[in-house]
Amino acid sequence: MKIGFVGLGNVGGKLAGSLIRNNFDVTVREIEECLTNEFKLLGAKVAKSPKELAEQTDLIITSLPSPEVSAEVMESEDGILNGLSENKIWLEMSTTDEDEVKRLGNKVISKKAIPLDGPVSGGCHRAATGNIAIFVGGDRKAFEKILPALTVMGRKVLHTGELGSASVLKVITNYLASVHLVALGEAWTVAKKSNLDLVKTFKGIAVSSGNSFVHETESQVILNGSYNINFTMDLVLKDTGLFDNLAKKLNTPLEISPKIVEIFKDGQKKYGPIAW
């Protein structure tokens, strides 16, 4: 199976790297030429456009920063849609909106190709080691066909149901992680001002009912004096906004979600969109 990979950013680059290391035939496309050159040195082929990439490969993967960018890569004149043909598979690994992935999915189907959504969860550090979780929605047979590729990118792979279901689950998990991160920041502030031993505090939280994946990973970064959790303000606002909009679409009033969006909007205003 020939694999095309569009988007070599924080997560996408690590996923594509796992495929290359495991000897898959990979063609890449990325607007940042320095990243393209890096992957060429690793053994990847380089496509001149998303359309060319889709024409040359069987499984086309997109891992992009926003639904708007995904739409541009798919629908532009030299985009993926114009390079698709019968039985090719498009796997959208970006964090996106359920309605948007279904809209693009219908266009993929019109080309007699097969759409799947396959967002990931677990953070960049896990993506780098092939230890990330992958949720996949869409045709079960197509899912099984690409499973060998999925299992080298992620250790835990879950088929979630119909197209779009994986994107909904991903938005929910990212919302929970964002809430945990905000709560963790407040907890560490109080712990420090209470003059607690922070190493013992870390261990105490880890063995208590207050533990979480976010604590086990991000608290270590915080204790090392860094804010760099490989996730910027603009990305967390995108994710929390997707969850908040989903709740509104479902006519489900929420209390915490709007406050979380407000907190990160304030953070972006103070520190900028690319602050950690």
What residues fall within each predicted segment?
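NAD(P)+-binding Rossmann beta1-loop-alpha1 motif at the extreme N-terminus of oxidoreductases
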Residues: 1-63, 88, 93
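Hydrophobic residues within alpha-helices
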Residues: 15-16, 104, 149, 190
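Hydrophobic beta-strand scaffold residues
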Residues: 26, 46, 115-116, 157, ...
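Rossmann-like NAD(P)(H) cofactor-binding subdomain of soluble oxidoreductases
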Residues: 52-55, 59-60, 64-132
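Rossmann-fold dinucleotide-binding core
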Residues: 96-175
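Active-site-proximal catalytic alpha-helix in oxidoreductases
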Residues: 129-137, 158, 162-194, 206-217, ...
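Interdomain hinge/lid region at the active-site interface
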Residues: 167, 211-272
